[in-house]
């Protein structure tokens, strides 16, 4: 269903999206306890955390390495202005394998002119992190179901014999306190165009774009092993009608072509914290096969790569009757971040899901739409934003 969305319920508070490492991620500025920090903007997780002064940096094998290896920006003071929460710690592992632990406490946090007082946040004192030397942490905008606080003081036993300490994260507190309407929207743009886009709280971005939106409901689906996610909203999960691929002939795949019980193969997370798109393996394989020349699967890396001058096929995601095409420059990552010196090839922006990775519409997709995360209506809306 297409709808003309002319105005949000309330005036919008906006802040710039700041591209990181050639658009492999996006950040926002926040005021945390009276100081400004740049943090990764992530709609695929829920916690707000900063690395603290004196933290311990480790490698993937949990061996201590110099703090510079974690590549954080400015570090936060190791205390909470509004107090530490007794017997509660922070422990999170992200989909790419990065992990962090620390403690929970309260701080006043401001984003885009909106301040939530005594927001529950984390200070990280132990981290395996592959940073960018700019961002100091991360701010998650997903549902509180995915928050990563635990009762106790020993993160080593979290997820075994400890109890989740679910809490209300920043964006949901801002909504619950009536500070913003129950929505936010994202207009992510390529940094090569001189900007990065905009995050709008409680309304729509102020940039120029096609304001005809297509809506689709959010779904409660347990895409990761989490009993809470089986009965509550967690990720911003949608069910597309399918995918359109134009090579020699037009091809279309969609969940209506398979058994109802396998529709979970098609659910997808809209996630600003993931660089690429991860799609059902047979679809990713077909997309990569129709490059000119065809992409190559690099077994050691577990990814598709191609010649950096290859021509991608036309590819679109079909959502509720509307085809959202992905700009070719987002389908093949040709900058420094996408170049593989060991093969001389470039990373493809569409990769297979599976092996614990759900279908994800990351920045490859989000740079081609304006996305409205309508929490109040339990739906998402998309407008095309392929060219700008």
Can you annotate each of these PLM segments?
Residues 30-34, 38-41, 48-50, 138-139, ...:
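Short hydrophobic beta-strand that contains or immediately precedes a catalytic carboxylate
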Residues 1-21, 117-259, 347-350:
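Aspartyl protease catalytic domain
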Residues 55-85, 158, 216-221, 285-301:
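Cytochrome P450 catalytic domain signature, combining two hallmark sequence patches
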């Amino acid at each position: 269903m297409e709808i003309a969305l002319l105005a949000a319920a309330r005036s919008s508070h906006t802040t710039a999206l700041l591209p990181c490492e050639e658009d492999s991620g996006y950040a926002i500025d926040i005021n945390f306890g009276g100081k400004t920090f740049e943090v990764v903007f992530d709609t695929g997780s829920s916690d707000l955390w900063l690395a603290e002064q004196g933290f311990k940096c480790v490698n993937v094998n949990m061996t201590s390495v110099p703090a510079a290896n974690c590549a954080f920006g400015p570090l936060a003071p190791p205390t909470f202005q509004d107090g530490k929460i007794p017997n509660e710690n922070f422990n999170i592992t992200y989909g790419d394998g990065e992990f962090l632990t620390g403690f929970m406490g309260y701080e006043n946090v401001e984003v885009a002119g909106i301040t939530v007082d005594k927001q529950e946040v984390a200070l990280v004192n132990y981290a395996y992190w592959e940073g960018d030397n700019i961002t100091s942490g991360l701010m998650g905008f997903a549902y509180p179901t995915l928050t990563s606080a635990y009762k106790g003081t020993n993160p080593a036993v979290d997820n075994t014999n400890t109890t989740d300490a679910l809490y209300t994260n920043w964006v949901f507190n801002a909504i619950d306190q009536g500070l913003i309407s129950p929505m936010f929207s994202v207009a992510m743009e390529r940094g090569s165009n001189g900007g990065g886009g905009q995050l709008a709280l409680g309304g729509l971005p102020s940039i120029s774009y096609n304001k005809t939106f297509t809506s689709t409901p959010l779904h409660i689906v347990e895409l990761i092993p989490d009993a809470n996610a089986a009965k509550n909203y967690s990720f911003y999960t949608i069910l597309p009608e399918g995918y359109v691929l134009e090579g020699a002939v037009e091809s279309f795949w969609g969940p209506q072509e398979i058994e109802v019980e396998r529709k979970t193969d098609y659910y997808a997370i809209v996630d600003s914290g993931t660089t690429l798109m991860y799609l059902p393996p047979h679809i990713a394989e077909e997309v990569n096969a129709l490059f000119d020349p065809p992409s190559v699967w690099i077994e050691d890396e577990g990814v598709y790569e191609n010649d950096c001058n290859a021509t991608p096929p036309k590819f679109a995601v079909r959502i509720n009757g509307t085809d959202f095409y992905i700009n070719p420059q987002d389908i093949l990552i040709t900058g420094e971040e996408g170049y593989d010196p060991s093969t001389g090839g470039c990373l493809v922006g569409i990769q297979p899901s599976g092996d614990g990775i759900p279908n994800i519409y990351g920045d490859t997709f989000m740079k081609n739409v304006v996305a409205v995360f309508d929490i109040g209506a339990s739906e998402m809306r998309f407008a095309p934003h392929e060219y700008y």
